[in-house]
Amino acid sequence: MSEFTLKTRLLAALEGKPVDKVPVCSVTQTGIVELMDEVGAAWPEAHTNPELMAKLAIANYELSGLEAVRLPYCLTVLGEAMGCEINMGTKNRQPSVTASPYPKNLDGAAVPADLLQRNRIPAVLEAIKIVREKVGPDVPIIGGMEGPVTLASDLISVKSFMKWSIKKTDLFEQALDISTEAAIAYANAMVEAGADVIAIADPVASPDLMSPDTFRQFLQSRLQKFSASVNSVTVLHICGKVNAILSDMADCGFEGLSVEEKIGDAAEGKKVIGDRARLVGNISSPFTLLPGPIDKIKAEAKVALEGGIDVLAPGCGIAPMTPLENIKALVAARDEYYA
């Protein structure tokens, strides 16, 4: 009988403390169509209805065996509350930002006093409370959200974000500061509602989009402020081949760094970050978990576990068309590793 609960194991693993086995969960989006059909909680309704949001999130814990409940399912909740226009997507396509409120300048841009009452934020907070009531105290809840860098680019548009980072650095920094403040407020509201871990996805901070120099000069300090100000264990997910900034990510103060398969194998990543942070991932969502087959999923999971991954997880958001049996295979791979 293990002395760990799912929650204490995950938190210990993220804090770099000894565990009996590596936890397996997802710190990125978990909504899949098969489960939407199975439990009757589908997108896009599950993005706005707290009962459906909770039901779909719990399904991937109860039916696949993932060892945490992670919600919501997109990176637009905070952006919408800050004035972005959103396309709510379809049953198998996530919501996305379609228009930014401040593409020309930041006149009138600020964190609204009623931020936490706006748009879908109350639904997410309510869903977290429902999940806690349903799964009890020993199952970890992971609150997901867009990171401050991605939020800033949503507020001013990707085009202005790129341009201002070079030509209008004062405006660029102002946008980052506003978005960092908003992100901290929302993250702490999720913690207060019952989230044990806050996982931010900050794809715009990736070297695929922003240079490592820009990361070090402007982005890193905002991520440090975020992790220092949020009252929980935190995980930073940045998409893509992040090798050029992985060491800088490890200095951002997050307990966990979530990475894709694009960084190479887990052992390499572990070498770079040392004991500054724990590595989460890095089983390919689009190229392994989505298409399978199961033996490939298990083989890649074994490589990650042998490489010293601290939390076994999909390398990015789970693709909505991923079969449930493929997610179960990820869990089985971890179990077999310790058998």
Swiss-Prot record:
Annotated positions binding Zn(2+): H237, C239, C316
The organism's taxonomic lineage, starting at the top: Archaea, Methanobacteriati, Methanobacteriota, Stenosarchaea group, Methanomicrobia
Annotated EC: 2.1.1.246
Annotated catalysed reactions: methyl-Co(III)-[methanol-specific corrinoid protein] + coenzyme M = Co(I)-[methanol-specific corrinoid protein] + methyl-coenzyme M + H(+)
Species of the source: Methanosarcina barkeri
The keyword Methyltransferase is annotated on this UniProt entry: yes
Gene Ontology BP terms: methanogenesis; methylation; one-carbon metabolic process; porphyrin-containing compound biosynthetic process
CDD domains with a match to the protein in the record: Mta_CmuA_like
Family: Belongs to the uroporphyrinogen decarboxylase family. MtbA/mtaA subfamily.
UniProt remark on cofactor binding: Zn(2+) is involved in coenzyme M activation: in the absence of coenzyme M, zinc is coordinated by a single sulfur ligand and three oxygen or nitrogen ligands. In the presence of coenzyme M, one oxygen/nitrogen-ligand is replaced by sulfur, probably due to ligation of the thiol group of coenzyme M.
PANTHER family reported in the protein's UniProt record: METHYLCOBAMIDE:COM METHYLTRANSFERASE MTBA (PTHR47099:SF1)
SUPFAM superfamilies documented for this protein: UROD/MetE-like
Job description of the protein: Methyltransferase involved in methanogenesis in the methanol pathway. Catalyzes the transfer of the methyl group from the methylated corrinoid protein MtaC to coenzyme M, forming the substrate for coenzyme-B sulfoethylthiotransferase. MtaC can be substituted by free cob(I)alamin in vitro.
Co-factor requirement: Zn(2+)
Keywords: Metal-binding, Methanogenesis, Methyltransferase, Transferase, Zinc
Recorded name of the encoding gene: mtaA
Protein name: Methylcobamide:CoM methyltransferase MtaA
Molecular function (Gene Ontology), one example: uroporphyrinogen decarboxylase activity
